[in-house]
Structure formats: C-alpha cells, structure tokens
Amino acid sequence: MIKTVVSTYGEFIGEVDEGADVVVIKKPKMVIQSEKGFGFAKGVCVTSVSEPEEVTIQKANVVMVVDTNPEVLKAYEE
C-alpha cells in the first residue's frame, strides 16, 4: 500500500513494508516544497541514484507513517 513516511531526514511516498526495526519504502519519492507548492525530488538524497528501487529507514528515525492525500497519490502515480 502506498503511504507517506515522515522521517527525521524528510518526507517520502512509496509502497511501505514495516519490519521489526526498519521501514522499507519501495519506489520511494522524496517530497519537496517550493513557493509553487509541492513536488518530488529526483532522488532520495543528494548523492543517490535518481530513482532508487527502495530505501530502508531505521524505525528510530521514523516520526510517522500515514495515508497519503489522494491528490498527492495521483501525482505520485503519474
């Protein structure tokens, strides 16, 4: 299921699989904001490949996992 994950590093959208100690996000997109609204970064950090298959975040660094706004989900899927 596609979810929004807010971590201590940033906000991500993707298919979430929660493990005991980690959250794995498949097909992750990092959410960025500008004066014109929100968008998606080309990678998940400055030096990552442009579209990683997945990222793993330690649960200690996850602030929350929530359902994604339908409009944002539509933009993610495009």
What are these regions (language model features)?
Residues 1-78:
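Conserved RNA-binding domains used in RNP assembly and mRNA/RNA metabolism
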